[in-house]
């Protein structure tokens, strides 16, 4: 028996505010020029947003307009929050991308586009949930998704403010299977509506009676049973959480990379996602690695899979591929033999990854809160520019979450 814990943060957490701003600006550059090369970092604090980074593009983006839109969408709309979309100051220090970097990703044959930087990226999948995600992180994300829905519905828990965090501890048995929920931690920003003790008691009661039943209702019956035994519940353990958001803590792009990925399971190469166009393999190759791992588990190759890809700047093919199945494989092949078959199934050149997952389109703001993985793919018609002319395009969001390579994997491993 052992315990494993993962955390998540809400869309109103200052670091996530920064991520969403960076990705919203990336989307607007890509909307007008799909060949845009973008790396945007955002800093948020009391009454102030600072954006900086490097961009190579033919498009013009109204930086202030889209920053204010994102902040208001998240819910920072009141002056009393000391950070709101209508009145915050905005400073832009975005400049042109280095030509030394650009030369590595521009080639005579577009399919041989090199990686935008060196580095290693990891993808992970397991069969603990229907989304092939680790259960502790999946539950932590659902808690905050439902809390945000409750806040926006405005019918109950009307004191909620945008900032919040969750943390879930799951107890596992000796066969590495979840056996029960051990601890739930919910910290949510709120209005000041009563004495400190009365506020904490009210919020804890509402979390237990309103939020958690909604969370459990989203789960399949097998996972619902994990909540049947008593568990520890901590709600706003400091007793009060009125001051929050960028007024309570500064926020920076790329500081929630474990929340964005697998909650501490698997591994992480260190590269953040938000604000980066898909020529940056920190992002695109991490999506590809997740796709490979998820399809391997879905195909029954193993119950748990970690995939590592590594690239060199300016080089199209990965310099290494690793697969780790943690002894859970269901086929008579070693992890090294499984890894050797990956390039025969998947084209891992950056240009082909970008093409397969439609990564040159404005799909990124949707990824910047509640995780880049374990999300349901969906198709949406987007207004974009093609050759300088307005156009509409059907684009799949979270395409790397599809399990449409299972047949290819089964064929490759049956030969």
Regions found by a protein language model. Give the residues of each.
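Internal helix-turn-beta structural module
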Residues: 45, 304, 311-415
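Glycine-rich anion/phosphate-binding loop at the beta-strand->alpha-helix junction
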Residues: 195-297
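Short, charge-patterned binding micro-sites
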Residues: 38-57, 313-317
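A structural-propensity feature for long, helix-poor, extended segments
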Residues: 49, 152-177, 299-337
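Conserved phosphate/anionic-ligand binding catalytic regions in large, soluble enzymes, centered on
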Residues: 7-9, 13-18, 114-130, 242-267, ...
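Glycine-rich, mobile lid/loop segments that gate access to catalytic sites or pores
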Residues: 5, 65, 69-243, 369, ...
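N-terminal, positively charged regions that mediate nucleic acid binding
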Residues: 1-39, 154, 406
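Alpha-helical support elements that line or immediately flank enzyme active sites
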Residues: 11-30, 124, 128-148, 276-300
């Amino acid at each position: 028996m052992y315990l494993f814990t993962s955390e998540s943060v809400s869309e109103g957490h200052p670091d996530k505010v920064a991520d969403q701003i960076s990705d919203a600006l990336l989307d607007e550059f890509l909307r007008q020029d799909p060949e845009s090369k973008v790396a945007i970092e955002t800093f948020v604090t009391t009454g102030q947003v600072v954006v900086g980074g490097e961009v190579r593009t033919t498009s013009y983006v109204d930086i202030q307009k889209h920053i204010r839109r994102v902040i208001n969408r998240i819910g920072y709309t009141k002056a009393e929050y000391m950070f709101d979309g209508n009145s915050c100051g905005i400073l832009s220090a975005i400049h042109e991308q280095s030509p030394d970097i650009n030369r590595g990703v521009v080639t005579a044959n577009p399919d041989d586009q090199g990686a935008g930087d060196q580095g290693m990226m990891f993808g992970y999948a397991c069969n603990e949930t229907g989304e092939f995600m680790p259960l502790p992180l999946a539950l932590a994300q659902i808690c905050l998704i439902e809390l945000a829905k409750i806040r926006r519905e405005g019918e109950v828990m009307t004191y909620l403010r945008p900032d919040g965090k969750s943390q879930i501890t799951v107890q596992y048995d000796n066969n590495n299977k979840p056996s029960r929920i051990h601890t739930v931690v919910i910290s949510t920003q709120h209005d000041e509506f009563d004495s400190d003790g009365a506020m904490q008691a009210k919020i804890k009661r509402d979390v237990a009676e309103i939020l958690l039943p909604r969370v459990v209702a989203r789960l399949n019956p097998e996972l619902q049973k994990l909540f049947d035994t008593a568990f520890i519940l901590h709600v706003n353990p400091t007793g009060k959480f009125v001051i929050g958001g960028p007024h309570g803590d500064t926020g920076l792009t790329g500081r929630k990379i474990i929340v964005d990925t697998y909650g501490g399971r698997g591994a992480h190469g260190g590269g953040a996602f938000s604000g980066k166009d898909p020529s940056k393999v920190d992002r695109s190759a991490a999506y590809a690695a997740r796709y490979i791992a998820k399809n391997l588990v879905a195909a029954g190759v193993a119950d748990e899979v970690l995939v590592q890809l590594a690239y060199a700047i300016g080089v199209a093919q990965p310099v290494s591929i690793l697969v780790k199945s943690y002894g859970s494989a269901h086929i008579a092949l070693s992890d090294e033999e499984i890894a050797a078959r990956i390039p025969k199934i998947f084209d891992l050149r950056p240009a082909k990854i970008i093409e397969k997952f439609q990564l040159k389109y404005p799909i990124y703001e949707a990824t910047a809160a509640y995780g880049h993985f374990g999300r349901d793919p969906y198709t949406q018609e987007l207004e974009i520019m093609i050759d300088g002319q307005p156009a509409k395009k059907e684009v799949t969001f979270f395409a790397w979450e599809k399990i449409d390579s299972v047949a290819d994997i089964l064929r490759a491993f049956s030969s």
